[in-house]
Amino acid sequence: MIFLQNIYIQGKKNEKTTWWQNFINFVQQKFNRIKMEKIGDNSYLYTVSHLDHKNTLKQLEKKIQKKQGKEVQVIFSKEAEFLKKQWKGKKINIETFKKISLPLLLDYLLEQIQEKPQTLLLQDIYFCAKTLNEENKQIIEYFLEKVKTVNIVTTELKSFQKLEEKCGKEKGIWITVSNNKRKSLNKATWIVNLDFSAQELETYQIHRQAVIINCTEEKMKKEKGFEGIMVQSFDVNGYSSICKMLEGAFTSITLMASQFPLTLDYEENVRKLKQMGVNIRNLIGINGKINQKELLNHKKFLTNKNI
């Protein structure tokens, strides 16, 4: 059987990559069976025009991984439906990508709900974090000079107080660390949940008009009387043409997350995201897409309260 099949490869570059690229180009020219096109940093699109029992996709995948490294991610296009299942098994960290998107997402929300143009530099951001892992540490340090104040709400006070002291001594910027369930979030208008569970977040008294961005994949619950905005996820524009082939099978955030490494270099990944020209298309709340009416109502509240 002859059919067109695309394979998208993303992974770390190693010493054998150049040799493998040359091999692909050679095959392309001599046999017109495999074509290679570079579509990003360490990202290549392989087009296989003829497959038989001696040249299966599984064998091709193993061969490419052997030459480029085991950490590559392989994404199959939707021309062959059964291949979607293989792609679904790949390790893609949606939560990490949500965190990488925070600067983009906060700028988008500011534009949508603030009556007058404002920047992150004027905002007080509250991060809910129970674990001081390398990922959360990099995020907090990134925002230190990007916002007015960084506030940490955590159950692990000792760990974060050490970070508080370090930031104060080394950068001259002091963060606030607290765990008062009644007071810590009751005046916060910008809340970013890094790793609290829905049950843990429910134990805190939250400003009824807060904007909450949830970076976990667990669905948050809307408490009675809450009139703010809960961003559970979002859709994006600006990803590669190969990802567009898979739009019908996967969410845009999943497709975009597949283009980022599982290991976190937060500042570098934020820079990469901006260079790709990614834009927020829709905000998704706990009950589906957040419409313009909800955003407009929130803008009116902020204007009337002068927040």
Residue ranges of each PLM-predicted region?
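Metallocofactor- and cofactor-centric catalytic cores in central/energy metabolism, strongly enriched
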Residues: 5-20, 27-85, 110, 285-307
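Structural motif
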Residues: 6-11, 49-52, 76-79, 128-131, ...
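Adenosine-phosphate binding glycine-rich loop
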Residues: 16, 211-307
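A short, well-structured beta->alpha microelement
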Residues: 28-36, 51-58, 164-185, 196-202
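Short, charged/polar "capping" segments at the starts of alpha-helices
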Residues: 80-86, 134-136, 157-164, 199-201, ...
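Glycine-rich phosphate/diphosphate-binding loop of Rossmann-like nucleotide-binding domains
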Residues: 115-182
